[in-house]
Amino acid sequence: MKIHLVSGLLLLLITASCSQKDATKKVVSFYHWKSKATINQQYQQALKSTNTHKIYLHYFDIVSEHEANWYDDGIFPTYVLKEVDPAYQNFEIVPVVYITNQVFQVSNLEVQKLSNRIKDLVHQISQKHFKKDISQIQIDCDWTESTKYAYFELLESLSDEFDLDVTIRLHQIKFKEKTGVPPVKKGTLMVYNVGDLKDFDQNSILQNSIVKQYITADTKYPMPLNIALPLFSQTVIKNKDNKIKIINSVDRPTFENDKHFKQINTSQFEVVKDTLYKGFYLSEAYGIKLEELAVTEIVDSYNTIKQSKLITNEILFYHLDKNSLSNINLSELVEKL
């Protein structure tokens, strides 16, 4: 009798332990943000190692190209998804539509007309590449206090047809009384591009000290949030007029070994002699900032979010890209998150 009782208790403990592990298991997804959704061995390895089942696939941008006139409202889709590898049909796809804030500053904006155009194009792309309609989409927009009413009206219209997820920036969490809370049931907190590109003492991609300026232990938000984290690095070039250009990669050995550049500190360089770099003409005195991410910085920033009162769900990495996946130890990162 005692043997059976002990065996039963052991089985119960093992089952409980497994249940706890399952409950805390990380759910990881990826963004794909290119007009041609290709797949290669590197992508496949990243998806397999993280047990990813969902891809947030960029479908198109909506931009305001010119002032409204007699012929049109100046609002058009750009960077429309052109090709999709059949391998993506094995994943749950969440279409992503990026809308610039300027769209909602257009005078006499016809929100319902814009909503219908977005619905139609999403369905067209889904049918073309996946032979079906997709019910869940993500809307990505860095709205402001002055544009919230038009943006929220659009979300309400889109909600009639789609299960919506919307992106939320750090400032929209901290200042939610001003920027408002979108009329949706779930969101994705964008924990990247948090700083100032022009501030060469910052890593504008991600810096935990900046995240802490917006998120505290008492921070709340009235909807569950996925957490979007960066994998990418970038080179920031600042000219004499303080204007910025970005190169979506970092080639540290070139700056450290080429005599056209002088190293100021770990991340900063100065052009000391005119030169060409990746198609950009760099003049003497231009500033160079290398923005690279360490696993520890991503983990620390993520922990700042987790230690708040925000309700969090899956982890979403930006993004499936050769340089991004080459510059970060993905296995180590996922293990530490």
Describe each region flagged by the PLM.
Residues N40-E65, I125-F130:
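Catalytic domains of carbohydrate-active enzymes, especially glycoside hydrolases
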Residues K2-L9:
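Sec-dependent signal peptide recognition
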Residues S19-L47:
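Boundary/entry segment of secreted carbohydrate-active catalytic domains
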Residues E156-R252:
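Substrate-binding surface in catalytic domains of secreted glycosidases
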Residues K54-Y56, Q138, T188, L316:
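Conserved beta-strand positions in the central sheet of alpha/beta enzyme cores
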Residues V27-H32, V63, N69-L189:
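Chitinase-like catalytic core of GlcNAc-active glycosidases
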Residues F232, K240-L337:
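Substrate-binding cleft of secreted/luminal carbohydrate-active enzymes
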Residues I14-S17:
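C-terminal motif of bacterial Sec signal peptides marking the signal peptidase cleavage site
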